[in-house]
Amino acid sequence: MRERLAAAGLAFYRGAVSPTLHALAPGGCRFQPTCSEYAAIAVAEWGLARGAVMAMWRLLRCHPLSRGGFDPVPLRPKPGGPHLRANGSNFEAKASRREPRSRDAR
């Protein structure tokens, strides 16, 4: 129910508020997908609480000094699969592939 309400609010923003803002300040969005699309995907994929936090973090990254670009919503890890850290690294998988260092190789 709450997710549907959030989706309706985002749809209203994209249909009524966003076009007005872009008419007043042309130039488009810095990011792809747009922040409202990102929020809709994040809420659908991660749920209202986590999706809203992800959307707010995205809004904080949207400022004049940001380069923008492609910034997709992170995918949920598959059950039983390796879990990625926030920066995309996979420490566990990398650690298991490392060869032990000998004491002589410094």
Curated annotation (Swiss-Prot):
Membrane topology: Peripheral membrane protein
Cystines in this chain: none
Pfam family, one: YidD
Name of protein: Putative membrane protein insertion efficiency factor
Entry function: Could be involved in insertion of integral membrane proteins into the membrane.
Annotated region described as Disordered, given as residue ranges: 71-106
Cross-referenced InterPro entries: Membr_insert_effic_factor_YidD
Family: Belongs to the UPF0161 family.
HAMAP family associated with the record: UPF0161_YidD
Places the protein is found: Cell inner membrane
Compositional bias (Basic and acidic residues): 94-106
GO cellular component terms attached to this protein's record: plasma membrane
Keywords attached to this entry: Cell inner membrane, Cell membrane, Membrane
Organism, scientific name: Acidobacterium capsulatum (strain ATCC 51196 / DSM 11244 / BCRC 80197 / JCM 7670 / NBRC 15755 / NCIMB 13165 / 161)
